[in-house]
Design a protein with these regions (language model features):
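Low-complexity, small/polar and acidic-rich linker and loop segments
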Residues: 1-119
Length: 119
């Protein structure tokens, strides 16, 4: 999938449509899928990541702003678009579907070597 990363009038911090647009990024039931004969629940990591970004957005709003929210808006949109461009599709086991920490997101991952950017 080809995606052009750019500033967007969508997915704002506190625009009239912000809550609806951010909520639409995560499918119903928070994106949990059930696999195998025992219907074991998993959450694709991208939905966990996008939900976390929305939580950060909402927390920022409750703390108030200094009147200049262009940088947080830029950062949220940049991270959102980056996640959509290269999503982590690893499945995270659901440990408590009704708890505040519903999934076990930690563990071994095969990742690109990010250290090369520091060389």
């Amino acid at each position: 999938v080809s995606m052009f990363v750019e500033n967007s009038r969508h997915y704002g911090l506190d625009s009239p449509d912000a809550n609806t647009e951010w909520a639409a990024l995560v499918p119903s039931e928070d994106g949990v899928i059930h696999i195998g004969p025992e219907k074991t629940p998993f959450l694709p990591a991208i939905f966990h990541q996008l939900k976390c970004l929305d939580i950060i957005r909402q927390a920022y709003l409750t703390e108030g702003t200094d009147g200049n929210n262009s940088l947080p808006r830029h950062c949220l949109n940049y991270l959102r678009q980056s996640l959509l461009c290269r999503p982590d599709l690893r499945l995270e086991p659901v440990v408590d579907p009704f708890g505040p920490h519903a999934v076990q997101p930690y563990g071994r991952r095969t990742c690109q070597d990010w250290r090369v950017v520091y060389k």
